[in-house]
Amino acid sequence: MEKKKAFTPLLYLASIIFLPWWISLSFQKSMESWVTNWWNTRQSEPFLNDIEEKSILEKFIELEELLFLEEMIKEYSETHLQNLRIGIHKETIQLIKIHNEGRIHTILHFSTNIICFIILSGYSLLGNKELVILNSWVQEFLYNLSDTIKAFSLLLLTDLCIGFHSPHGWELMIGFVYKDFGFVHNEQIISGLVSTFPVILDTIFKYWIFRYLNRVSPSLVVIYHSMND
């Protein structure tokens, strides 16, 4: 009976980690053809009025400039110019296809991430008992650690999250989240988030040390500040 009680929270933890990923992946595979068909049939008309990607606009401009340049060169025959127009038309169709695939990718990934969030929210509401057991295990593990190990872990965690080299890690992490949701890479937004998140986390962490750790474990705070200095 005790083994069963101990096994249940572990099974719950494994399901939290793997089940949302498996369900979202299955949903993405099963809905890909439907979303593709819906986008191509319902959204094909307004596409040319909704081109937002800078790279695609630059490609269109390059194609137009190439066409004008070739038309200005009189040595080329009409057949060559006709082939050039056909090639530009094919390139345009390819750009439209790439754009549509990007939008479909965005819809699918955004939907699957919403599903993962709903599943995790449901787990947190329905599995309150298992969460309490897992929380007690974590607290017991942390309680058995020495203050030196705790201070070292806090110092390592803060250096990783808000240290001197943390912006590069934040840039990779935010870029991964952007890609996972299917959004187009935007350097300005990512730079703004990278410059904002560490400051917010640093403020929250200092407040947590001041309000909680000073009251619960003053010796840990002393060791942490000694290591940090």
Curated annotation (Swiss-Prot):
Cite the entry's keywords alphabetically: Antiport, Chloroplast, Hydrogen ion transport, Ion transport, Membrane, Plastid, Plastid inner membrane, Potassium, Potassium transport, Transmembrane, Transmembrane helix, Transport
Q: Which cysteines are cross-linked by disulfides?
A: none
Membrane-spanning ranges: 7-27, 107-127, 189-209
UniProt GO molecular function? antiporter activity; proton transmembrane transporter activity
- Cellular component terms (Gene Ontology): chloroplast inner membrane
Membrane topology summary? Multi-pass membrane protein
Per its UniProt record, what InterPro entries does this chain match? CemA
Which family does the entry's similarity section mention? Belongs to the CemA family.
**Function of the molecule:** Contributes to K(+)/H(+) antiport activity by supporting proton efflux to control proton extrusion and homeostasis in chloroplasts in a light-dependent manner to modulate photosynthesis. Prevents excessive induction of non-photochemical quenching (NPQ) under continuous-light conditions. Indirectly promotes efficient inorganic carbon uptake into chloroplasts.
Q: Which HAMAP family match?
A: CemA_PxcA (MF_01308)
Q: What is this protein called?
A: Potassium/proton antiporter CemA
Query: Native species of this protein?
Result: Lactuca sativa
